[in-house]
Amino acid sequence: MHVYSIDKDIRRKVIVVIFCISIFISIIMRYLLSVPIEFIGECIKNVELLKILLQIGNVLDIFLDIISAPVIYAILYWWFDKKLWKMEYINKVLQIPDLNGEWTGKAKSSFGDNNEYTMKLTIKQTWRKISFVASFPDTNSKSESNCASFFIETNGDKKIGFGFVNRSREVSAQQYDGYNVLELDSENEIAGRYFNNRDNSAFGIDGGNKGQFKLTRGANGT
C-alpha cells in the first residue's frame, strides 16, 4: 500500500481534533488515577522488593507517562486510520469514500480489436494508505498502483486518480505504465477510464491507447 493525497485540508483537521481529544483524555485519566496511585505508593513503601524498584525510578510516574497525551494520540490515530474513519457518521463528515473490496466487471480498450474483457479490481484502503490491484483473467496480466489522489469536483462528484504499472506472466508481453480515473456512480458502482503508453499497432504509432470500464463491488466488499 502507498499513501494517497486528498485535495482538501481534512487530514490536518483530523490530526488537530485527535490531538485535542488525546490531551482531554490524558487529563481526565491522570485526575481519576491520581488518588489510587498515591494510595498504592504508600502501601508498597513497606515492601522491600518494590522499595528497590522505587529507588531505581519512580514506577508510578512511569505509569502516568504511559497514559500521557502522545501515547493516547498514537493509539487513537492508529484506531482512526484502521477503523474509525469508515464509520458511517464520521465518513459523512470526511467525505472520503471507503473503496475497500473486490470490484468486478467489464473493460474495453482501444488496444487491438477493441475487445471487451473481464476485469477484477481489488482495493485496500486505510485513512492514510491505499492500493489498487487490477487483474485481467482473459489476458493473464495484472496492474498495480504506485500513486493515488482523491479529488472532489465543484459539483460534488468524487473521483480518484491513480498511476499504475502493468505486468504480464507471458514472457513476450511488454510492461507498461498508465493512469486511471475512477468516478463513483454509487456506493457500490464505479466507472473508470484510463490511458497508457503500451505500443498500439492499430494506431500506427509507437505507443498509447485508452479504455474504459464499469465495475460493481461484491456483497462482502466492505
Residue ranges of each PLM-predicted region?
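Central antiparallel beta-sheet cores of small beta-barrel/beta-sandwich binding domains
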Residues: 86-222
